Regions:
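Structural alpha-beta junctions
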Residues: 25-30, 55-56, 157-169, 187-190
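Aromatic-acidic/polar surface patches that form glycan- and anion
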Residues: 5-13, 144-151, 202, 213
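Leloir-type glycosyltransferase catalytic cores
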Residues: 113-115, 239-261
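N-terminal pre-catalytic "stem/leader" segment of glycosyltransferase-like enzymes
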Residues: 1-40
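Short hydrophobic beta-strand segments
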Residues: 1-6, 30-34, 129-142, 172-173, ...
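Donor-binding and catalytic core of enzymes assembling or modifying cell-surface/extracellular glycoconjugates
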Residues: 10, 163-247
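Secretory-pathway luminal glycosyltransferase catalytic domains
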Residues: 36-166, 251-254
């Protein structure tokens, strides 16, 4: 049996779930997901969210296990009865086209969790000719030494490019600091739903994307068909302890990357 540890926010949970599905395909053994990380209160809160989506996440049951970290080789695992994977696994090379298509279907919020306000926004966005999701990540990034907070200049460049190539663009702003966004942006729609998973579903409904250095908007853009995606060319403030490899993985899709310098 394969056991994948779930931890972090929604974007990280999606990466860990997808990696588990990849491991299941490669090994031919079932995957289970360890959700114990969410049994502890954290600041800021990072609730378990995969139960809101269309995928089926199996519970775990094991007595002995070997922890496998991201730096370890997967080649020597065949003889282990129970393998426990601990990491974020943020690498799109894990997903072949068949798995990616399945993830596109599974990474939708179950309709039983849709609210009236969400449904109204969803229907409006789907009718928009060129709905563009713009994601601003601030929040915990403001107080973390390694996280890079994107400047308003980045978004100005991205918006100028989108407005030059898309007819009648309609901008929908998603953020964990919506008040800051209201001070910066004009002639846009501000999405203020409290549930992150519903914001993610609305973001997926958009046709094009201006993403932040965040797994949340990365996934919304990565799952889209034929979208124009603008992303920052730098993911982290520092490039230490393997972060340059992580950054290269996150910036591997064929998108337009804006130089932050």
């Amino acid at each position: 049996m394969n056991v994948v540890k779930l931890m972090g926010g929604l974007g990280n949970q999606l990466f860990q779930y997808a990696f588990g599905q990849h491991v299941q395909e490669v090994t031919g053994r079932p995957v289970r997901y360890n959700t114990s990380w969410y049994n502890v209160e954290r600041t800021p809160p990072r609730p378990y969210r995969l139960n809101k989506f269309e995928m089926v996440v199996g519970a775990i049951s094991y007595d002995k296990y070997k922890i496998v970290k991201e730096k370890d080789s997967l080649a020597s695992l065949a003889s282990m009865d129970c393998r426990h994977f601990y990491g974020y696994w943020q690498d799109p090379r894990f997903y072949n086209e068949i798995l990616l298509e399945r993830l596109r279907n599974e990474f939708h919020v179950k309709q039983e969790f849709w609210t009236k306000e969400f449904t109204e926004w969803y229907e409006y966005i789907k009718l928009s000719k060129n709905a563009i999701a713009l994601h601003v990540r601030r929040g915990d990034y403001l107080h973390h030494p390694d996280h890079l907070v994107l400047t308003f200049r980045y978004y100005q460049k991205a918006l100028a490019y989108m407005q030059a190539i898309k007819a009648d663009p309609e901008i929908f702003v998603f953020s964990d600091d919506i008040e800051w966004c209201k001070e910066q942006f004009e002639d846009v729609h501000f999405i203020e739903l409290p549930e992150d998973y519903l914001q993610f579903e609305l973001m997926r409904a958009c046709k094009h994307f201006i993403i932040a250095n965040s797994t949340f908007s990365w996934w919304a853009a990565f799952l889209a068909y034929g979208a124009t995606v603008i992303a920052p060319n730098q993911w982290n403030k520092t490039r230490l302890n393997g972060s340059e490899i992580h950054e290269r993985n996150m910036l591997s899709p064929p998108w337009m990357y804006i130089n932050l310098l």
